[in-house]
Amino acid sequence: MTTLQEHTTPNGDILLYSGAPNFKMLDTLAQGAGDVWHSSFEQGLKNTFPQLMYQTAVHWWYLNDFNDVDTAISWRINPEAFVVRKSVWELVGGFDAIYDSKLMSAFAFGINLLRNNGGVPLYVKGLFSDASLISSHIPKLDQYKFFRKHFKATYRPVYRFCN
């Protein structure tokens, strides 16, 4: 279970966060686009979980992370260092508890937010400047659980051993 702290911006927006974000930058970000903000590229998560390319349309442009950008749409959320609007967290239901890995739960949250709920998860360079690198390992069983839950029923027999 992820324990999140609460921050209220000067405009009254209620945000939930994990880690130690730059609050001045965060107050500015909350006035604009985005529902989730993170700095996961610097934390070792850039282009993690490339196996997703085998289960989604190749034209789905959010599959790859871009180089040399300060802000970009990215569903690769670090569960130890991110910020989310409280209303969005409650609407989507937070991280899915079916996964053993917190990282897979965070990725599934980001993909679900972007793909199914019209939300915008944003990578923001420098929002979490003191966050350290994390392991990008996702257990195979969690990968299978993800594919089983999020893709066509015709693929499910392949993943039937995941329960």
PLM feature spans:
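Short charge-dense sequence patches
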Residues: 32-40, 54-67, 89-98
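Conserved donor NDP-sugar-binding/catalytic core segment of glycosyltransferases
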Residues: 4-54, 119
